[in-house]
Amino acid sequence: MSEMATIARPYAKAAFDFAVEKGELSQWAQMLTFCSEVAKNKDVAQLLDGAVASEQLAEIFISICGEQLNEFGQNLIHVMAENGRLKVLPGVLEQFILLQHEFEKVIDADVTSAIELTEQQKADIGAKLEARLERKVKLNCSVDETLLAGVIIRAGDLVIDNSARGRLGRLSETLQS
C-alpha cells in the first residue's frame, strides 16, 4: 500500500496544486472519484494490465469517463497513461483527499463506541474534538460491543481510549507492574 501511495503522491500533489490555483477543488475531487471508480472496475482493470499502447489506453479511459473529465483531467489521464500509472488512480484520489482535508483544515475522526451514539452525543464529541484539534472534524462512527462501555476516538495521530475494555487493560498492566 505504501508503494502505491508513493507512486500516487506526485500526481495527487500536481492535481491538487492545479485545483487550488484554479479554485476547482470540489470539481477535481469529483473527477478523481469518478476516475478511481472506473479504474477499479474489473473490466477496466484487465485493460490496464493488458498490452495496450499508452496513447490508446488514455483515449479508451477518457471515452469511458465521458463528460466527467474536463480538458485538464484528460491531460492528467494522458500523463498517467504514458507512465503506466492509471492503476494507481485510487491512490491518487486518496492522496488528493488527504491534501484537500489538510488545506481545508478538516480531519477524519473514527469514533468506536460500545452502543450506537445519539445525534447529540455525536455533536458533543465533534464539537470537543474541533476545539481540541482546531480543525473541522468529520466523524466516522461505528459500534463495537466488545468495548463494554465508552468510546475510542482516533483522529490522525491522536488516540483517546475511554472504553471500559481499555481502562481494564490499563488497570491490569498497573497491577502487574
Curated annotation (Swiss-Prot):
InterPro entries the UniProt entry points to: ATP_synth_OSCP/delta_N_sf, ATPase_OSCP/d_CS, ATPase_OSCP/dsu
Gene3D superfamilies from the UniProt entry: N-terminal domain of the delta subunit of the F1F0-ATP synthase
GO function terms (MF aspect): proton-transporting ATP synthase activity, rotational mechanism
SUPFAM superfamilies linked to this entry: N-terminal domain of the delta subunit of the F1F0-ATP synthase
Keyword Cell inner membrane among UniProt keywords: yes
Main location (coarse class): membrane
Coiled-coil residue spans: none
Membrane-protein topology: Peripheral membrane protein
Keywords noted in UniProt: ATP synthesis, Cell inner membrane, Cell membrane, CF(1), Hydrogen ion transport, Ion transport, Membrane, Transport
GO cellular component, one term: proton-transporting ATP synthase complex
Localization per Swiss-Prot or TrEMBL: Cell inner membrane
PROSITE patterns, A to Z: ATPASE_DELTA (PS00389)
Function description: F(1)F(0) ATP synthase produces ATP from ADP in the presence of a proton or sodium gradient. F-type ATPases consist of two structural domains, F(1) containing the extramembraneous catalytic core and F(0) containing the membrane proton channel, linked together by a central stalk and a peripheral stalk. During catalysis, ATP synthesis in the catalytic domain of F(1) is coupled via a rotary mechanism of the central stalk subunits to proton translocation.
Quaternary assembly: F-type ATPases have 2 components, F(1) - the catalytic core - and F(0) - the membrane proton channel. F(1) has five subunits: alpha(3), beta(3), gamma(1), delta(1), epsilon(1). F(0) has three main subunits: a(1), b(2) and c(10-14). The alpha and beta chains form an alternating ring which encloses part of the gamma chain. F(1) is attached to F(0) by a central stalk formed by the gamma and epsilon chains, while a peripheral stalk is formed by the delta and b chains.
HAMAP family linked to this entry: ATP_synth_delta_bact (MF_01416)
Protein known as: ATP synthase subunit delta
Species whose genome carries this gene: Aliivibrio fischeri (strain MJ11)
